[in-house]
């Protein structure tokens, strides 16, 4: 899957998202995918070739590089973006199933009054409610879990988010404790912090969207409960009308009894 296909796929699901979800997609592709494709690959393109150690012992440089960088930053970022975008597949499958069922009912004549034709069903925006609400919130929850998990993996693999200028390596077959040097460590540290910051922003947006959906459901249920407790409008008007009729009737009887016979 290339990045264009991923953009088309997630962008299609974005039609049915909330406003916060649309902001999340923008941050994902502008500040993460574009940076990864345009700039980060250029910065990390020479990572293994320019990793130098002050020894000529065969195999020492490769072993030290594998020890300090077991997984390439770019490959781990790409894997993170794929995992974070994958939960949108749940929403896409749910929407596709909803449209398939709507089209089937339309052909049977059950929803002729709701849709003009089959194209109208495809253009309709599916509201986030009912079973789709559970699917959508589940996808957001998995996004948050994946973001947090990959941030921890980054910190665990590289002992933090800062790339040092000099690395001390004493692993076999190195003859002793040797110094190893990374190409452009400051530039790579800046990119690492930027990508981690973008990941934090995306995770906060996911948390905000999840809270928004939960509060929206709570407000909707509270409003529904108040509506069920309150008397209907026509019954309230009828009771008020009966009270007015009783008052008028009592006033008329009092006026009649007040005259002498």
UniProtKB/Swiss-Prot annotation:
GO biological process terms, semicolon-separated: cell-cell signaling; ear morphogenesis; gap junction assembly; gap junction-mediated intercellular transport; sensory perception of sound
Cellular localisation: Cell membrane; Cell junction, Gap junction
Residue intervals passing through the bilayer: 23-45, 76-98, 132-154, 193-215
Pfam families for this protein: Connexin
Topology of the protein relative to the lipid bilayer: Multi-pass membrane protein
UniProt similarity note: Belongs to the connexin family. Beta-type (group I) subfamily.
Subunit field text: A connexon is composed of a hexamer of connexins. Interacts with CNST.
Record-given protein name: Gap junction beta-6 protein
Organism field: Bos taurus (Bovine)
């Amino acid at each position: 899957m290339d990045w264009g296909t991923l953009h088309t796929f997630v962008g299609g699901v974005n039609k049915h998202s909330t406003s916060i979800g649309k902001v999340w997609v923008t941050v994902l592709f502008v500040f993460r995918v574009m940076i990864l494709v345009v700039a980060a690959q250029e910065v990390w393109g020479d990572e293994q070739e320019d990793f130098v150690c002050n020894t000529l012992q065969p195999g020492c440089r490769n072993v030290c590089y594998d020890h300090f960088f077991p997984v390439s930053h770019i490959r781990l970022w790409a894997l993170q973006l794929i995992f974070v975008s994958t939960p949108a597949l749940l929403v896409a499958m749910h929407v596709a199933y909803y449209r398939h069922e709507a089209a089937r009912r339309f052909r049977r004549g059950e929803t002729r009054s709701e849709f003009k034709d089959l194209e109208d069903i495809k253009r309709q925006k599916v509201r986030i409610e009912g079973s789709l609400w559970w699917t959508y919130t589940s996808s957001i929850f998995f996004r948050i879990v994946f973001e947090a998990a990959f941030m921890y993996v980054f910190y665990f693999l590289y002992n933090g988010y800062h790339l040092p200028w000099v690395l001390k390596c004493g692993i076999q077959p190195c003859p002793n404790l040797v110094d190893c040097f990374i190409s452009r460590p400051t530039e790579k540290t800046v990119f690492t912090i930027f990508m981690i910051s973008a990941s934090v922003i995306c995770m906060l947006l996911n948390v905000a969207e999840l809270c928004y959906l939960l509060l929206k459901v709570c407000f909707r249920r509270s409003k529904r409960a108040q509506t069920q407790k309150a008397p209907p409008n026509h019954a309230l008007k009828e009771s008020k009308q009966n009270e007015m009729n009783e008052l008028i009737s009592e006033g008329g009887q009092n006026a009649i009894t007040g005259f002498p016979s």
